[in-house]
Amino acid sequence: MSPQTETKASVGFKAGVKDYKLTYYTPEYETKDTDILAAFRVTPQPGVPPEEAGAAVAAESSTGTWTTVWTDGLTSLDRYKGRCYGLEPVPGEDNQFIAYVAYPLDLFEEGSVTNMFTSIVGNVFGFKALRALRLEDLRIPTAYVKTFDGPPHGIQVERDKLNKYGRPLLGCTIKPKLGLSAKNYGRACYECLRGGLDFTKDDENVNSQPFMRWRDRFLFCAEAIYKAQAETGEIKGHYLNATAGNCEDMMKRAVFARELGVPIVMHDYLTGGFTANTSLSQYCRDNGLLLHIHRAMHAVIDRQKNHGMHFRVLAKALRMSGGDHIHSGTVVGKLEGEREITLGFVDLLRDDFIEKDRSRGIYFTQDWVSLPGVLPVASGGIHVWHMPALTEIFGDDSVLQFGGGTLGHPWGNAPGAVANRVALEACVQARNEGRDLATEGNEIIREATKWSPELAAACEVWKEIKFEFQAMDTLDTDKDKDKKR
């Protein structure tokens, strides 16, 4: 047995401390199809070699601790330990590198995102030998994927339920997000749905506050849905936020939504927690409810480039835990999102098989083995002038959600919804006729304003509104080479 892969049991117990790399750095290791693979961005403290830092990550997120312990001799360390099997420098950074770590599948409980994250992104992120640590990507082996139920229904089943095909779905977050009474809230939902939207939505922090208790909101929103359906002949929905202070209340709200006969409920999966989310997803699957997922709190975890966890990992975890929609950024709106990176995790949400593609931030090939897909939701600071770009970027299998871009229309909520529906239909028709939305988008919208005064009014209001800030989360490049160019 080589010194690099020795087990403590094989050489007898010796009390004391030894370098992590002697046990957990194994560059000769050949990964198995059943291993969970992780790519960590590691920033070690000065004086800590990359090999030791990478091995420390593998150790502290699997079987290791700071000193040798005699109980190591009671198990097979080679079978259960994580292994740092590769290191690569980060382009343009002198003190960062990517550490590749393989974890044996037996370390994780079946069907539990909670347990997976507790190990992989647990205490190791506070390890003093590291200045910063970020989980960039995970490869989930098919053997582990098959232990998860995934989304309650998936993209195709949702389209069949709603009888809507060949275009993105349209939504609107009701604003102001806090302070409306339940009756006025329901009125706004009705006006938006009547005007042509497919969905309206509770904002992430609408739960059950003194100004609007959850049961009242559910009742008035259900009335709005049924009234709008009767008038338009289309199936409508409102994302009723079931998130609560405890799982029992969350399930009570989901049960009431089912009793009302509405098509969809909502959950804040990061603040609510993965255990609660998986339970709600299973209930939705068993009872025919779609599940919309909001990612509130994600930027606390994923926005800093050198520490935390990339959203592509949170997106994969959500697909495993369960959700039919999830917010994914817009690229063009007010929230963080670089184009190629966003398209990378959008594909990870929707597609069945995704090849490794570092140009889009995808570190590993991922096979979902027919786990249902998730619709990405583009939401945040978007309006009718963004419609061509959104349609071109996200394609048909997406939800485009305009809050202020609907309710801020100068003529009211229903005309705002009409403007968005007309803009979307114009873009879809132009695309189907072979026109290039990226280059002809503004012209397509202007042409549509000739037969839609509602769209013309919206275009006039928001013609100057842009959110042109550099994204924090960008692809790694060699800064010296970029300067020379």
From Swiss-Prot:
PROSITE patterns on file: RUBISCO_LARGE
Site entry (Transition state stabilizer), positions: 334
UniProt GO MF annotations: magnesium ion binding; monooxygenase activity; ribulose-bisphosphate carboxylase activity
Record's catalysed reaction(s): 2 (2R)-3-phosphoglycerate + 2 H(+) = D-ribulose 1,5-bisphosphate + CO2 + H2O; D-ribulose 1,5-bisphosphate + O2 = 2-phosphoglycolate + (2R)-3-phosphoglycerate + 2 H(+)
InterPro entries given in the database record: RuBisCO, RuBisCo_large_chain_AS, RuBisCO_lsu_C, RuBisCO_lsu_C_sf, RuBisCO_lsu_fd_N, RuBisCO_lsu_N_sf, RuBisCO_lsuI
E.C. code: 4.1.1.39
PTM summary: The disulfide bond which can form in the large chain dimeric partners within the hexadecamer appears to be associated with oxidative stress and protein turnover.
Binding site for Mg(2+): 201, 203-204
Annotated compartments: Plastid, Chloroplast
Subunit and interaction comment: Heterohexadecamer of 8 large chains and 8 small chains; disulfide-linked. The disulfide link is formed within the large subunit homodimers.
Active site (UniProt): 175 (proton acceptor), 294 (proton acceptor)
Family statement: Belongs to the RuBisCO large chain family. Type I subfamily.
Modification N-acetylproline, positions: 3
Broadest EC class assigned to this enzyme: lyase
Function comment: RuBisCO catalyzes two reactions: the carboxylation of D-ribulose 1,5-bisphosphate, the primary event in carbon dioxide fixation, as well as the oxidative fragmentation of the pentose substrate in the photorespiration process. Both reactions occur simultaneously and in competition at the same active site.
Domain of life assignment: Eukaryota
Signal sequence range: none
Protein name: Ribulose bisphosphate carboxylase large chain
Cofactor note: Binds 1 Mg(2+) ion per subunit.
Key words of the record: Acetylation, Calvin cycle, Carbon dioxide fixation, Chloroplast, Disulfide bond, Lyase, Magnesium, Metal-binding, Methylation, Monooxygenase, Oxidoreductase, Photorespiration, Photosynthesis, Plastid
Record bears the keyword Chloroplast: yes
Residues the record lists as binding substrate: 123, 173, 177, 295, 327, 379
Positions of modified residues (N6,N6,N6-trimethyllysine): 14
GO cellular component, one term: chloroplast
Modified residues (N6-carboxylysine): 201
Miscellaneous section: The basic functional RuBisCO is composed of a large chain homodimer in a 'head-to-tail' conformation. In form I RuBisCO this homodimer is arranged in a barrel-like tetramer with the small subunits forming a tetrameric 'cap' on each end of the 'barrel'.
